[in-house]
Regions:
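Intrinsically disordered, low-complexity regions enriched in serine, threonine, proline
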Residues: 1-2, 31
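N-terminal Sec-pathway targeting helices
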Residues: 2-19, 23-26
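Generic structural signal for short, solvent-exposed loop/turn connectors between secondary structure elements
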Residues: 5-6, 75-80, 172-176
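A residue-identity detector for tryptophan
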Residues: 9-11, 28, 99, 164
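N-terminal capping segments
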Residues: 26-146
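...with weaker cross-activation on analogous glycine-rich loops/strands in unrelated enzymes
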Residues: 118-197
């Protein structure tokens, strides 16, 4: 009987170790989780009446798909300065997710921001008097000013789940930016598509 008890301990310890490993992987979101959509929560997904690039996909969806495409490319985090302004496709920061999403929808966000900075330089905190089209469209504080001027401000409460729509743009205290996904967690809170050096 004594021998049998001893032989169970390695199995029990191995099972306990496996459970602890799985709990740790789940805690740090390293295991795949089921994702949900707005429809799972009875939320209507809004569609833009516009289709700037004429591809048959509304602009809100195009923004979200463009952001997802950029994230799937896994660009290396690189806040560097690039002649012409645009980093290579395999490089970028959080703001690059946004202009690439707009590009996917048929908009030249860089040109729009550059034009507004040229006309309203004093409103943009990162410009410091001299516009530089090679970098200013890639700075979160400048994007925040631009979107505050030309976009509708929505809720910042993540628990107002019906208010969050795919393609929405979110800024965080002027230091980070991303685009809302069409995927949500089990509580209905949408995921953010962004680049933070992941």
């Amino acid at each position: 009987m004594e021998k049998r008890r001893k032989s169970r301990w390695p199995w029990l310890l191995a099972a306990l170790a496996l459970v602890l490993i799985l709990l740790g992987l789940d805690y740090w979101n390293l295991l795949p989780h089921r994702t949900y959509t707005a429809e799972h929560f009875g939320i209507e997904t809004l569609q833009s009446p516009l289709d700037a690039d004429g591809d048959g996909i509304d602009d809100y969806t195009d923004l979200m798909l463009g952001a997802r495409r950029d994230a799937e490319n896994h660009p290396a985090y690189d806040p560097g300065y690039f002649a012409g302004g645009y980093p290579p496709e395999d490089r970028g920061v959080c703001t690059d997710v946004v202009w690439r999403a707009f590009q996917n929808a048929g908009y030249d966000l860089k040109a729009l921001i550059d034009a507004d900075i040229a006309e309203n330089t004093g409103l943009y905190p990162r410009v410091q008097g001299t516009p530089d089209p090679n970098i200013h469209f890639r700075r979160v504080p400048n994007l925040r000013v631009f979107f505050e001027r030309y976009a509708e401000s929505l809720t910042t409460d993540p628990y107002e789940i019906a208010e969050w729509q795919p393609g929405d743009i979110v800024t965080f205290e002027g230091s980070h930016i991303g685009i809302i996904s069409d995927k949500r967690n089990r509580d209905g809170i949408p995921y953010l598509i962004h680049n933070s050096g992941q």
